[in-house]
Amino acid sequence: IILLFIICGFSPLIWAVDGCNQERLSPEEFRAKQKAFIIEKAGLTKEEAAKFFPVYFELQDKKKALNDKAWGLIRKGKDDKTTEAQYAEIMEGVYDARIASDQLERTYYEKYKKILSNKKIYMVQKAEMRFHKELLKKAKK
């Protein structure tokens, strides 16, 4: 879950690799590739995709905001003068952001159920994880 939390937060910044050429994707390009991948792998119809992706990307935006907040806290800890009490505050904030992200996932699952079957939701989740895994593999090459 933590890895997925980090990947989702930085996903628009990941480099995509086509052959030997590395190309930085804009957030819009990243979303377009992600959407196409998920539609194909999860077998979404045009109607399902049209209803699903606005809700899906709304969740991604909210999770990114939480992730940005967590990373902001982590950066505060780089100062050598950070006290133990400040580290405690940082870690509380990071864990609170992770919990909030998980709660958002649960809330949006309920929204997804109004659009897709549970099987399709499962297929979307599987496709999303595969998409990020493939991006990371390509980025390592």
Named regions from a protein language model:
Residues 1-3:
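Bacterial N-terminal signal peptides that target proteins for export
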Residues 34-115:
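Amphipathic alpha-helical segments
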Residues 20-24, 102-141:
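Amphipathic, charged alpha-helical segments and their helix-to-coil junctions
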Residues 18-36:
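Short N-terminal segments immediately surrounding and downstream of signal-peptide cleavage
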